[in-house]
Amino acid sequence: MVDIPTDYSPQTWRRRDWLLLSGASLSGRLLYAQPAVATLPAAQSLPEELARAIKNKQPLIVMVSLEGCVFCRQARQSHLSPMQKNGTVIVQVDMRQNQPVLDFAGKLTTHDQLTRLWRVSITPTLLFFGPGGKEVAERMEGAYLPDFYGPYLEDRLAQGRQAL
């Protein structure tokens, strides 16, 4: 036989309610815990950003992204954000955004106008720029298989370094 408690004092109910609320709160936090969202700095002055990259003997990597793009988020999280933390100069241009930016000629334009000028229609797209704002490696367009994204990215970086 099971012993059923018969103590229904207010203190017992408060203790039980507190335990239930604590457990629900903790389980909700664990359930909805998400890794920190990886972000890249928005392009503001392409000539300055290019100069920093070339100083590091690297091409400037520009990621063209679109708000809500799952593949863009995966590329940032898995590859681009860690590279940026290790010193690679990477900036983001947001398709369909009117955020101001200086283009390679020093003219004020917008992120959306740059994506049109560069004829980018797929996100994510990675562009690799060298001296004079010229593309120095083949673009990476769209999503790649996760196991191959890193090697393809390293290959493009090697192409870009050779062109410097």
Regions found by a protein language model. Name each.
Residues 128-161:
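Non-catalytic, surface beta->alpha helical segment in thiol-disulfide oxidoreductase systems
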Residues 29-50:
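N-terminal "domain-start" segment that seeds a small globular fold
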Residues 56-67:
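Short active-site neighborhood of thiol/selenol oxidoreductases, capturing the structured segment around
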Residues 112, 116-127:
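Structural micro-motif
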Residues 67-71, 96-100, 133-134, 146:
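Solvent-exposed loop/turn segments at secondary-structure junctions
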Residues 87-108:
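Thiol-based oxidoreductase modules, predominantly thioredoxin-like and allied folds used
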Residues 1-13, 17, 22-28:
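N-terminal secretory signal peptides
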Residues 73-85:
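Typically the conserved alpha-helix immediately C-terminal to a functionally engaged Cys/Sec
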